[in-house]
């Protein structure tokens, strides 16, 4: 059996970095080199301040960096020396041309394929780690075949990641499953067995699933679509709960005890974010449309539509509760990452909520324990989010949550950081304007509602009526749909 002794991973991001760090730690006899064109990112991986925040990641990197784990910008050299090359580059949603706003942009995948074939000789296994459309491996293989040379044998596998940001190290060390897809040919199965042997250093054989390449690629899209679907499903029920007086947490607990349903991903919130869910569902929608399956496409599009609706509904609820206007009102935004235990802000609901409130003239004071000020400003300065000097006029980045809440009309929790449960809310209430509102978009304060009401807060939370004093405005503001993938629309100057 072919033995993998050297691994190269192209892409030092949220997938490539943690994945290869764990492989290096679990396989001390395998040399793992993570490469990237971004020199600053590689320098960060080689420093004490890693470019991404992930619980446990720093300890893993420090245990094997310089021994059998290396980070480099010497991409061609790493490819030439490797027995196996992981492709772990970004596959963003297209923002132009055919499939704009839905199809995956594979330009980085194509660039990797061309670079690999240019710098390879002999036998090498090339493995998709990035989330890709079905039959992307066939496109890679066509590039290899068109640029073949004597004695070159490149085998293409699919090995999608299923880690979740915030629990990536735990997920990598104890995965629910490892999925490897390859050709049914003898050469393809030889490559599959070689990659299986790498994972068998720490993953039980029964958890390593092998399929054909296309099933593996589709399984990744389907898995993310199913998870996003569950979130949108419970969020749809949260709207019904708010209208009827039911509590979505109680409903989720009741249905989650049914073993056929289960209790995971039934946490109502302001909406899902991150780099994968929306991108992969939209990719699935586009795939269905391209294959003339419009009914299937419409079914999955509704998952995205419901997520957009939940964000708009939450922002509208904030505006309604604050006497139907937030113009020039200070509002504290607590949390900017798309979920706790990560510094990733991609498709974060905080961006959308901030955009809707800025459009109404609110003055936002934003705090997040792990997202740098520069990243927040960059996200909110996106041409589709804000206009001209809107961010400089309306956004302040706070150093701590108390500073953000000082003098605020309301505080809005957009990320479920554990620290927000431990804040001194009596201190916060004294410094806020009255009535003081809390809008809990992640239901992190459920156990504190009685205490907070005694202090004097007006509480609005997802999927539950809490404050009886809320004034419903008949002319509730209608917030238009918005996507980070939309081209910016310039409003005419008056």
Swiss-Prot record:
Disulfide-linked positions: none
SMART domains per UniProt: UDPG_MGDP_dh_C (SM00984)
Annotated keywords: Allosteric enzyme, Carbohydrate metabolism, NAD, Oxidoreductase
Regulation: UDP-alpha-D-xylose (UDX) acts as a feedback inhibitor. It binds at the same site as the substrate, but functions as allosteric inhibitor by triggering a conformation change that disrupts the active hexameric ring structure and gives rise to an inactive, horseshoe-shaped hexamer.
Keyword NAD: yes
UniProt-annotated catalytic positions: 161, 220, 276
Any GO CC annotation of this UniProt entry: nucleus
Role summary: Catalyzes the formation of UDP-alpha-D-glucuronate, a constituent of complex glycosaminoglycans. Required for the biosynthesis of chondroitin sulfate and heparan sulfate. Required for embryonic development via its role in the biosynthesis of glycosaminoglycans.
Name recorded for this polypeptide: UDP-glucose 6-dehydrogenase
Species: Gallus gallus (Chicken)
Chain's gene name: UGDH
